[in-house]
Structures are given as structure tokens and as C-alpha cells.
Amino acid sequence: MEQDQQTETKTTYADQPWKKQYSKHIPSKMDFAGLFLPDFLQRSVQNFPDKAALIFQGYVVTYKELQDMVDRFAACLKSFGIQKGDSVAILLPNTIQCVVSYYATIQLGGIVVMNNPLYADPELEHQFNDSGAKVLITLDLMANRMIDLRTKTNITQIVSTSLADYMPIAKSFVLKTAGKTRKISDYLPALPLIDKIPVLGNIKHAVCELQKLTADVKTAPDVYDWKELLANFAPDRSRAQLNDDDVVMYQYTGGTTGVSKGVMLTHGNMSKQLQQASIWFPELEDGKEVVLGALPFFHVFGLTTVMNFSVYKGWTNILVPKPQADQLLDIIHNYRPTFTPLVPTMFINMLNHPDIKKSDMTSIKACFSGSAPLAVDIIHEFEKMTGAVIIEGFGMTESSPVTHMNPFDGIRKVGSVGIPIPATECRIVDLETGENDMPVGLPGELIVKGPQVMKGYKNRPDETEKTLRDGWLYTGDIATMDEDGYFYIVDRKKDMIISGGFNVYPRDIDEVIYAHPKVQEACSIGIPHSTRGEAVKVFIVLKDKETATENEIIDFCKTRLAKYKWPVEIEFRVELPKTNVGKILRKDLRKQEIDRRSNG
């Protein structure tokens, strides 16, 4: 009966019912300014020249200083031969050098390629070659590896920089006199120790503790030192002539579905995305906020909602290269951020930290969660313990990335990814052809259209044709829309489990198991079943010091799920595989399960 009533609804996607949820300050039709990212930086420099733009481990860069650094490095890149349309690869964590390199490249009309520092050489080789990158900026910790890898790519110049380049004098001294480790994986866990370096005291001990944070770079042709370059080049304030359709970056997909693809995002995409986001948060004032820069900038979520949004609004960005829970809590206490975009894992880890109840998080005006679904129970628990409000949203690399958000000052439906942001159209279509609209309330594939939607995939016309159809971006996500225009992500299309002829969405199972008081993380997959075709298996990480049995979890599910959704297997693990931004890799668990069964 309920389904019949849903089918008979008169609301259609063309009606755009979500617009009724817009606050009075959100226009139903946006009038976009014809400005681009370099213009936004220049505007913030003019309006807030002496305001802190970036803070890294206590080192402060004002907007005026940031522009000077950008102009100097732009002059350097120009001397390397970089011009409009050329690709520059950035292989850095969240550092001052990362922000400067990005804006210097796009100021020249170059195309940025943001690479993940934790990727293995074959992954980086693919991205360097696919993008045609000519110059690479990286840490000294990775430089020797990249010098060796360069022979397999078209990269001509490498710029090496150090974590010590922008730190208060005492910290810089320790790093520059430390040991010579060359593995990026070695240095990441040690980053929180930087804050514990004494100005006076046992420097020898500090050197030993921090010897993993710097490295010698071997001599090689066309390998340059960052600080020397900035000192030797005068600022070049020239700007390339930019258009909406010019590509600003090749943002490679996370590889959760196979070989990463280079998403071509344009200057128009990124500019309009920032304008869409800005109008959504009316209480966040230009030049007056502090953003927690914990999301990695090599991921488009962090790049847009932290790095570029902060520059657009003239805010202070607290750079966090390694966002561990204790470090996040310390930064929130010391720097009092007002805007904190995070991913679910960061919320969960802070929530499980023993100091969470002692932490004062009242400075936060808005929390934004994206990249992966945030379990409803986690939202409730985090808000109860912190007093902060979490706004959940949705997006993907191909949409710059945000398409949906819960209203900041309107009705917030917990569990929903919200409503389409201004100038964004959405439909739910059938899974078979992708051409027919599903009745409102019934699941189908979410497709979106808007100024933030990518130009296409680099060197992949076949994939572009499948994903972009008549301007509509086919997300691969199964979703529903309610009568008010709020959207709910049911699951990934490729993750759906078919059990006994019924569609089972793993997120439904995950949500229930997250409600169990002993469970910290959960991820469901489909496994072969002799009679049903597929059945549900769940991988679980328990909270610290908790114990549970398979029967206990299954019995918990039996009182909360339809019989065809009941798990038949539970596997407890110490940790689950994740991307570098904390998204649980369901495909990896599925592959591990297939391999295990194949090997008997």
C-alpha cells in the first residue's frame, strides 16, 4: 500500500521541490560572477592583506605574503617553460608549499595534477603519464624516489621542499639536523610530535624523535630546492587569460573502482562551485572565520571545501598534514576553528578519543561531512557530545565535488544528504536504461546537471560517453527523493546485493549495525549463497575493549531487518581497509573474500 501511494504521487523531479526548502538568502536562480580562482586570491589579498591566510605548525603566512610567494613561484614555473595548458604535478600533504604551488600554476593557466603522497610508484607513474605532467613539486622525503621514477615519465624538472621550510626557528632547526629517512610512510605517524619540540631543553632527544621528518636529496639534473627558487625569482604578477571552459586541473579518481581516471575540471566548474557553497553558509562571514584544514587537498573534497573555499572567503586555514584524533582535538582547542569539513572516519575517531568529553568545541559554527555516508547514530552521538551541528552532503570528483547539502539554517533531515544546491538539477532514473524517471520515493540511479559538472575524463572518451549523457552526470549511486526534495543515498549501484530476488542495499545493513553499542565500524558485502544467490556478510571493528560474538550481532539484526537482509556471516577485524580520506573500501573487502574462497 505504501509503495502504491508513493507511485501515485504528483510531485516530479522537474518541479524541483527542493527549492521550497531554500532559505530567503538563497536565490532560485544564481547570477554567477565571471571570476576565477586567481581572482579570488587577489580579492582576498586586497580586502585582508594582513590577515593570516595559512598557519602551519605555528608558522603564519598572511594573504599579502601568500600572493608574493605565488607570484615568485609562478615566475619560476614560467622559467621552466610552463605556459597555459601545461600540466604541473603536486605531490604534497597539506602544507604551505602545496597551496602556493597550486595557485602559481593556475595563475599561469597551467593545469594542476594533485597526487596522493601515499600512492605507490606504479599509481603515480600512471597519473604522471596520463596527465602529461612536465614539472613535479614534492617533499624531500619522496624526492629520491621521484628522481628514479622520472625516467619513466615526461617530467623534466623536480622541485624538492621540506617540512622544515616553514616552521618556527626551533622546529626548523630540529628538522634540518635530523636523520635522513626517505620513506613518506615513516614520517606521517611522527607529525604530531612536531608540536612537542622544545625551544629550550633536550634538543638531542627531539632530534632523535623527529629524525623521520627530513631527508637528503641526491644530486641530479634539473632538481631544485624550493626555498632557493623563491629567493632567486622576483614576483611575476602577470595573469593568463582564462575562460570558463579552460581546464584548471586533472583530478584523479580515488581508484575505488579500478584504474584512476583523470577528471577534467574547468575554471568555470571550480569558480561556480565556490559561489554555490558560499551562498549556502550565510553565517560564515568573509574574512572572519577559521577553517580546520584536515581534509587532504589532494582529494577534491578537501581541495574545494577547505583550501579554495578558505581563499575565496578570506579565511584562515589551519593546515593539518596528518589528521589524527588527538591532533584534531588539540587544534580545535588552540585555534578555535569555526568551520570543520571532515569525513566520517575523523568524526568516529574523535568520538572514540578519551579526551572528547573534555574538549571544548563551541567555536565551531558548522561541521560538514561528506566523501562517505555518516551513520545516523554517529551523527546523533557526535552532536550530543560536542554541541556541534553536522551538515551532511553529497558529491563526487566529477562534480567538483558538491551537489547536495542539508540546509544550514533550514530543515535538516538527519540521514539525508540534503537538497540540491543552487543551479543544480537532479533526477532519479531507472537502473536498466537510465532514461526513465522513477516515481518520487522509489530508488533509482541519481543523475545531476549543473555548472560544477566536469568537462569529461582525460584520454577516456568511452568513459566520458557513459558517464555524461546530454549534460547529465550519471553518478552510479542508488538514491531516493522524498516529497520535500530531500535526497537519500541508498547505495552504490555496483554494491547492491540481490538475495533471493530481493534488492539488498549494504548501507541499510551498515546503518543497523552501527546502532549496536559495541560497534565502531561496519561494512557489508554480498557473498555466494546456495539457495538465495547472494547473502550478506558483515565485517566489523569493535570499539576499544569491547567483545562480541557472531550470534550476538546476527540476533541484533534479526529484530531490526527483514529476513532476507539478515547477515549469514560476521567477521571481526582490527581495522578495515580505507582510502586515504577515510572511506571504507568495500571493493577491497569483496576482493579479499573472493580470494579467500578461491583458495579454499
Locate predicted features.
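Conserved AMP-binding/adenylation subdomain of ANL enzymes
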Residues: 271-290, 298-339, 353
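A short helix-loop-beta submotif of the ANL/AMP-binding
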Residues: 87, 93-113, 117-121, 129-135, ...
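AMP-binding/adenylate-forming catalytic core of the ANL superfamily
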Residues: 136, 450, 455-456, 463-466, ...
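Conserved AMP-binding/adenylate-forming core of the ANL superfamily
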Residues: 31-33, 38, 42, 50-83, ...
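Conserved ATP/PPi-binding loop(s) of AMP-dependent carboxylate-activating enzymes
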Residues: 419-423, 434-467, 504
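Gly/Ser/Thr-rich phosphate-binding loop
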Residues: 177, 337-342, 351-412, 425, ...
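Conserved pre-ATP/AMP-binding loop-to-beta segment of ANL
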Residues: 185-252, 259, 284-290
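Conserved adenylate-forming
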Residues: 77-83, 232-246, 250-293, 313-315, ...
